[in-house]
Amino acid sequence: SYSELIKLPYSRLPKLFAVKALDAVVFNVPVDPLRPVDKRDNYVKRCMGLPGDTIRIVDRQVYNDQRLMTLPDRSNGQFSYYVRTNGQGFNPGQIKRDFDINYLKNSQVNNQNVSDVLQITQTEFIVTIPEQALEAFSAMMHVDTVIVINALASHQFSEGTPEALIWYYNQAVKPMPMYPNPMGGHSDTTEYAWTRDNYGPLWLPSKGSTISLTRDHVLKYRRSIEIYEGHEFREVNGSYFIDDEPATSYTFEMDYYWMMGDNRHNSWDSRYWGPVPEDHVMGKPVFTFMSWDKYAKGMDKIRMDRLFTVVHGKGKPTSYLLVFLALVALYYGWEIWHKRKQSRQ
């Protein structure tokens, strides 16, 4: 990882289980070209699309081959909302305790610490709210209006849209180019007028599938051909060349997956850098040993209800912490008894 002079072949252990739709998945982030695949940052996102599927997002809802993808029980879906109050602000401690919303001071906000609350005017805020807390949050006495933020492909707003919401959209949402538009581009000049809330359709390549090399396909899949599958790709006078050979089609060598975060409006995921190739997938998280809330105080930093829980499954997760502590106590009890027995002998 310190030099490009020596490159060892990249090999992987065979997989034990296949990735399924809606699984939480651990993978190496694809957009980190300066480091080898296995040295790139590990991300955990939810698989919303499998190889061969077609992904489309309509009004924040994800569709896979026209089937609505509903998040499982143990997910934590969140969106950002425009919130207007009667003039009273929010108490950071209260909304953290009641809704698990992190309201950080400006001095605390950086690339690693993002506040769930952005105050725009004296009475107007952008708030990221967990779906299960939305109804209770909206019922707070001093909350007058709650509007979900839905970025339209047209970048247009209906009559009566609050000026503060338009300002936030133009400053924080609109400038973010969606894949397969160039990352250095701008939403006013992009090829695909897609947004984080209205996206696609985009087909996910599967191993062995073949596409014709049209302009649309080249824009969408050139990154897979060049970066992930390692072929030289050139366009000369409207004709395409792969590894210096004329090409009118391409057959994919890997499967690709669509990964998205449950916090849809604060997630760096496939909407921005495209499908994840199979050689970047590490596995699935199975068990939560420790869950740490860096924004809480004191012992509240440890999320006791999440310790020793199974990641996948139906209903609320069951903590096996007491079972673990009992096993530890039995082990040490046996150790003490065994040593005493040996000393007597």
Predicted regions and their residues:
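Extended hydrophobic leader/signal-anchor segments used for secretion and membrane insertion
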Residues: 1-345
